[in-house]
Structure formats: structure tokens, C-alpha cells
């Protein structure tokens, strides 16, 4: 068949080198004549197609004719008898044909005979039995030959096999080969064909077949194993398949081999074919034609079907190394040139058209084409031309620089410009021009950044059932569109989406859900743009706990040992670290409790400590870093015979509590140590003093055993033996035990107490006689009880009924140091001996401890009556450790960078708890050290620091925030200043207005609100305190509603006065009730002092705190609406009144208190001026910048 040419060609056929038939004009198809014998047409054909431009020639066609295959008449085969295990061959021998038929072995119902390792078919159609079984007996083995080209199936005569039982003693048969015969065979195969090697064995048991290649490894990609490994097939054979192959057939009896020598040759095939072009007169034409084959083919040339001889008369033509060279071509050289390659396996022919013509040059590639590429790629700039002679083109960069001057740039034979490994500097305009013409085109090259994966997927180890996330981070040139990210697993595309149950793709990352073993593999991320792509991959290794161990076996079964073995587990990508042997001693594996017996690292273990008369069930688990496997699918059981006990019970002892009996006890033996039925404990005992006496014995099933009438604390020899129905254990060890103990009869004598230090004494005694202990002497107990402190008054003495301190000492001790006693206290001490029954009589002794230095005093908040005075207050030490004789006060001025002189004041009155220091520097702080004194010396000092308070002053800087009918006034109180009373005066700046004045205000209050002002009016404000005054102006906010609405009666003066009177009356009634309720009450501090102080000290404290109560009563009589009166009353009292309001002030860890003076009150004080009143009813919330009430500045500094 030829490509159609213009003008239309004529066709003629040549058969076996001679003209065959007439010349055909319309079609080259050759049709046989129906009356002619087909055998007449058998031969080798070649077709010639010719027109004005030349003659083309076809490849050789070989036509073979043959009659339709048919079966010859044959005699019916006799039924053949075989023994079980013998081999057999049923031969097909189909009619011969040029095309091998396909063979089907079937029965009479057209069911295929099953093929397996034992029953195999060969390429020649024979049916082979490696060994026969009884089921192979049948009468309808039929070979059906299917001729596909003839479309017929020829069934041969059925064959019969009868299989009888074997009488042979030998049960197995050695392996050998049915087909092929011998030890070696050779095969010749052509390149591109299919090679099939057969290895059909016989033997019992059925042999296994294994294929190998001698000279190299057998490639799994190039070979296929068919018919249960009996055929080895290689499709599309290559020269590399040439070599030696071997088949090994093996069963339990032996192995047999067959070697195959495969030789690969090849019919001719093209490696280079000539190209068709248009040529101009005078050009040189080179037609290059190369072919390969085994053996190497011979190449010849023809022109229009006429061979070119080696001595061509035309000197312009010559053949060299398969090339046909035409020099200085003319129009008459237009023709079809044939190149033909021939070897013994066939021939191939190719036609090449040479057209000599003159045509003007043209550029076929469009102008202004843009080429985009990424760095590192190769760019091909097209410049396709047409013309004869062939146009000569050249390239320039920016219309001036020759392109070929760049080492990276080359020009192909078709005129294209090749730029290799492009970079950013290659981004330019390139011009292609045709020489000796004005024709040219331009092309632009734009080089972009490469697409690059900067964060490739990582290799992950994932536990089965969890999720895995593979990240793929990349960079792309901003001039390119968003890339596509494609994930692949083992080279196959993954379709990921948010709706996919397995794969989710999130911003380029791949999430694999619920990872299973089949998800393990190589995952690659491919980032693609319109210009380039990049690929990176990572591996997901799925880990899981191991599979259960397999093939659990018990071997070497002995009376007391057994060997356990098993097949190792599948590790599931995490190495097995150990195997756990579990044991169950129930009657069945479902009964009892599975327990861990031991862990081992290998897959075998010997257990050599099995108990007799026991049943064991075993199972194995494998352990890796992920977890523990399920147990082996089935457990194994092992029972041991009964035997005498091997051991006796341990820890035999006496646990007697009754003086006239003995309890013998021991540690019960494990049931597995019984070793047989009828297990009991046999207990023996006799007095230790009568070592030759007869043993008394008793048998019991479990401990303990009680022996009566033994006497008090008598020693016995005791032993316990294990017995069962098969006998007794070895002779047990004898131990010494005792009957029950009784209380000791005597107390330790010669008890004495000697003072070592002021708070420790040495206690000595004489030990009790051993016979009086009536048991094992466990030691002595010293009971220490404090009767009271000598410095306490009789009414406040500590009771001695509390629990005493108990000190135990060992039995061999005769003295003991008792420490940590209290100073100046009375003690009672007793001592007794004790055994396991209890304590004996006590010996008693009394003693006292001397005085010691007092404990520290407790500083209370102190006051500053003036700028140069401080009054200190304190409580007496909680532990005086003697009689307090007075106090030592030391103080000094705090001077930074230097040491100031220290002042000392000795206070010789023990009942005094306050002291006033005068003539202090108001500008300095002081440190105070106060110690209590008794006859033993001075106690540890309490340390406090502080400074005096300065005189108060009214605020000079006020922050004002005006509203419609009020103004908020706030200020910052001075540091260390006393509270000072003052008031605000304010005046409307209108004609005829009069001054108004607020109530009295505390300087420490920090906030006040003037109410009842007119809207939109300017006011003048003054602060008055003594002869001091400060002035300000402010304006309230204008409110149209306030000016429009009539004055409500609630704002009238008479109504406000009425309401104020009612509120005042109610408050007076409440205060009277409170005063009546608290009348005669005592201050809690006084109650505390009454419980600890003496009568002389009590009188002074009652007088002092009486003043405090007077102040409190006076304050209660003050109205909340009259703070100025309260302030006046308070300031007229002495300094102790300020102390009364400061009892809640706290102390720091170093002893200094936080709110130091009454001028800085605790928020719970009683004299706050910020209480709601008819004049000042709405207090604003606290501010972080300024205190908003009097309580805001009374707290800690």
C-alpha cells in the first residue's frame, strides 16, 4: 500500500522475480481468479508504483497456501491402566499447519480438564501427569485443536485412563523431566519474537519448579511464569535475552536440572533512514541509510526500482558505507530512491523521494513570537524556511551580536536556534534572517525563576491507624500562574480532596487518614507550571504491633521441664524486642488467669522448674516499640505427674499471746508446691530443755496451730513438714519458739535525773531482772510530762493532764539524754520495762528547769503625737522563760552611707508596754531594737523602723471635673502628713450671689463632690483652713432640660431638710441600740491580756484600754452627717486614741508594719469621712490614679 501522489501512479506486480499480471491503473490490489487453484498463487511478491516523479517499490510479501486441516482416521486407542503415583502422557498430535493451532483438553461435556502443578499441557499439545491419583480415571480425555485462521476446531478421539491402587512398597518417586528430554537443549529466537521455555516434571510428591539464569539475574520485568511455573515466557525478545537458563525440579526425594541455551538473532531493522527534501539544481544530496541485524545485513540502493551497481556509469553518483551521494543534481535526478537491507532472516526496504526544483526562499515561522523558559532549561527558537535551493539563515542578538558567538548557543540543521542551560542574562530579542534577502523575523526570550521544591516530603514512621501529613513547600516565579500540585504513590496518581475518605490535600500538603499497611510506600510531590516542574519524594513506613507468633510447639517434655518454641512474628516495621511467655494453670485455657511467666529475646525457651501434679497452658506474645501482639492463635497444654513435696514451709515461728498457750505459724506453701493429692502440714514440737524427749505432732491443712497448757514463756523446738499421698518432703529444719508472754513484774530501780544543760537532762536507771520480764525484753519507755511553767500565775498555769512525751530506749540501755525541755518549768518523769505483752510497773522522778533568756516582744502599731515624738507599743514575750524584770530599748537614726550614734533607754518596769521618745528629727527615719529582760539575761530584740508624722495642710492642687449640677474635686494627700480638716467655699459669679460652704473634709479623703449647683454657671472655689486659702474657677455644663423644667418639690429646701431630719433621727436610734448592746463589753485584747498577764500588769492595761473604749463610745455618739464634729472630738484625745483605730494594720515579715501610723488608717477604720450623707450621697468608684474616698488613703503604704 503506497501514499497517494499527484499525478496518480500505475501499479504492477512481480512474482518470484517475474512480471505477474497486467499493469493496474486505479488500484494496486491483486485479487486471485476464482477458477484458479490457490496453489498457483503461492510465492514471493513485490509491487511497483510509478508516475512522472519516479517509481516506488514495496517490501517482499511471502504468500503461503495450504488446504484446510482435517483429521485422519485412526484406530481407537485402548484403555491404559496405571498405578497411583505413576506418571502419564496423553499425546495430541494435531494435523500439521503453517500456523500452530491452540490446544484445549476437554471432556465430553466440553469442560476443560483442570490444569495445576500436577497436570500440565505443553506447547505441542500433549497433556502431562506428574503423578496419577484415583480421580484421574476417566474415558473422555479429548484433545481439541483450534485453527484460528481457518476458524475450525478438530476434536480427536477420546482417550481413556484407568488408575489402580499401588502395590509398591515405595510410596514416593524421584523427580525427573517429562519434557524436555535430556539435560540440555538449544533455542534460536529472533529479536521481537516470543520465547517460551518449558519444564514439565514428574515424580511423587509433585516436584516444585524453579527458574534461574546462569550468566545474570532473571529479570522479573522481562519474564513471565505460566502454567504453575512450568512455562517461562519472554515477550518481545531482545539481544540481551541471549544466554543460558536453567530449570530445577525438586521434591522430597531429589532434584533434577535442565539447561537451555538461548541464541538471539535478528532480521534487519532500521537504525537510520534517509530524509526527504526539496533540492535545487547544483546541490549535493546525501541519503544516509543504516540497518542492523544478526547477522549484519547487506545494504543496496535502487533508483526507481533499478539497482545501482558498484560501477555506475554516472560519475555524479556513488555509494559509500551505505550512503548514496548525488553531486551537482539536475532536474533529471528527481526520482524515488530505494534502500534495501537483507540478511538470512529477511529483508526490509524504504523509499525516499528526491525532488529537484527551484523555489524562492520564505520564512514560515510567525514573527514576534515569545519564548518563556525557566532557568536551566533548553530553548529552541524556530525559524522554519522553505525554498530551493535550501535558504541559508543566520541569527543575531539585539540585531547586532552574532548569536553563535555565545558558547551556549548552537544552530540546528533545520535553522532552529538552540540555547542550552538558559539563565536570566539570556532574556533578549533574537533575529533570524535569510541570507541575500530582506526576510527576517524576531523572537523574544524571557527566562523565569525555576520552580523548586524547597521543603520536600520527609520520610515518616507512622503508627497504623493514625494520620500522616506530608508537606511539600515550593517556590514559583511570580510571573507564572499558580502551579498544580500532584501527589503520587509508588508512581500512581492520587486523587485528593476534602471529601476523600483516605486523602486530603490542604495547601499543597497531603494528609493520609487512618494509615494502614497498604498505605506504606513512596509518596512523591510534583509541582508543575506551564513551563517546568519539580519532583520530590518521601517514604511512609507504617508501624504496628507485631503479628501473633506462629507454630507454637512443645518439645523435650520431661517430668520437671519442657521446651517451648515458635516461629518469629511479622515485625510490622518495628523490630521485636522480646517475646512474652504467658502461662495459665486452669483446667482449660478459658479457665484461670493468664499470667506472664517470663520475657525472652529468642524464639525458643526451656522451662526447667515445672511443678509436679500441674496442668499448664502456654501462649506467646511478641513485643515491639509500638505495643504487644495478640497471643498465638492456639495455646498448648502440658500436664506433669504427681510426686512427693520438694520443699517444706518457710518462716516457721510462734505468735503466742496467751501466757499458757503457744501458737505455731508458718508461711503457707503455694498450691503448685503441693506436688500431689492429699497435701497437709505435719507439725512437730517438744520442750527445748528436753532435747531427747519424744516429738508431739499434729497434721493440719493450713496454719496456725494452737498448743495449750504450755506454761508462761517456755521455749520449744518446732518443725513443720509438708506431706501428700505420695510421701513427705525432706527433713525440715528445727526452730526455737516460745509460749505466750505475760506483763513484766518489776519496775526499773535507782531512777535519777541529772541536769546537763538548761533544757536537757540525763536519765539513769538500773535494769530489771530477766526473770521478772516474763518474755522478751523489748526495751524501756520513758514518759515525760510537764506540770507547768514557774513564770505562769496560778490562775493561768498550764494543766498537766495533756498527753505525755514517750521515749523508747533499747533493752540494753541504762541511761538516756532527754532534750528540748522548756525553761523555768516543772516536769514529772516515769520509766517502765515492756515486752510483747505490755508494760510493767513505773518508777517516778520529778525535776525542774532553770530560767532562760526571754523570747522576743511583739511590736504593736505606734503613734506620732507630734513631728518630733513617737510612742512605741508592744506586747510582753509569749515565752518569758522566767520573771520579766524590764525592757531594753535601743534606737538610732537611719543615715545612708554612715553610722549614726545609738541611744539606749532602760525600762525597769515589767508591766509597762509603751514608751514615748521625744526630740526626734522629723526629717529622718529611725530603727528601734526592743528586748525583754529577766534574771537569765536579755532576750532576742524585736526590730522596727519608722518616722514621725508631719503637720497636715489643705490641698493646693485640685483636679476639677464639672457636671451639669455638680463638680468632682480630687487631690493627692501629702506623704507622712497628718489628717487635717478643711472646707470648700464656692460663689456664683453673678451679681448678688452669696458664698456657700461645704461640710468639714479630711485632707486624706482625696475626693469630694459638690452637689446642688446650677447648670451652665461659672463658680469661684476657695479652700479654707485656718488662715490659708487657695482659689479656682470652674463652670458647670449647660443643660437645656434643667432650665426648661419647673423646679421639682424634691429640690426645695424644706423637702431636703425634712428628709435629712428623718434620716438623722433613724441613725440616732440605731446608734443608741448599738451602745446599749455593747455597754459593759470588753475589748478582745483585754481578754487576751487577762488570760496571760499577772494582776499587777493587768491593772495598767485595763486603764489604758479603758481610754480606747471611751474613744469608741464617743465616736458612736457622733452623727455620720457631722464628720467635722467627729474629727474635732478625735483630735482632742491623746495618742492612744489613734492606736485604737489601728488594730487591724498588718506587719511585714521583718517585723515592720505596713500602715505605720493612725494618720494612714486601715480601710476598716471608723472615722471615714466618705460616708453617704444628704450633702454628699453619691461617692464615685475608686480610681487608680487618685484615691476616691477617705478609705482609699487609709490603707497600707
From Swiss-Prot:
CDD domains: FN3, Ig3_L1-CAM. Disulfide bonds join 92-143, 199-247, 289-339, 383-432, 472-525. Its main location: membrane. Cell adhesion molecule with an important role in the development of the nervous system. Involved in neuron-neuron adhesion, neurite fasciculation, outgrowth of neurites, etc. Binds to axonin on neurons. Residues 1-58, 69-160, 165-263, 268-355, 360-442, 451-541 form the Ig-like C2-type domain. It is a single-pass type I membrane protein. GO terms for cellular component: axon; axonal growth cone; plasma membrane. This is Neural cell adhesion molecule L1.1. GO terms for molecular function: cell-cell adhesion mediator activity. Residues 548-643, 645-742, 747-852, 853-952, 953-1048 form the Fibronectin type-III domain. Keywords: Cell adhesion, Cell membrane, Cell projection, Developmental protein, Differentiation, Disulfide bond, Glycoprotein, Immunoglobulin domain, Membrane, Neurogenesis, Repeat, Transmembrane, Transmembrane helix. PROSITE patterns: FN3, IG_LIKE. One of its GO terms (biological process) is positive regulation of gene expression. It is found in: Cell membrane; Cell projection, Growth cone. Residues 1-1054 are extracellular. SUPFAM superfamilies: Fibronectin type III, Immunoglobulin. The chain crosses the membrane at residues 1055-1075. Residues 630-640 have a biased composition (Polar residues). Residues 630-655, 1115-1135, 1154-1197 are annotated as: Disordered. Glycans are attached at residues 135, 149, 221, 298, 414, 421, 438, 449, 708, 959, 968, 1002, 1027. Residues 1076-1197 are cytoplasmic. Belongs to the immunoglobulin superfamily. L1/neurofascin/NgCAM family. Expressed in postmitotic neurons in 16-36 hours embryos, including those in the brain, cranial ganglia and otic and olfactory placodes, and in all classes of spinal neurons.
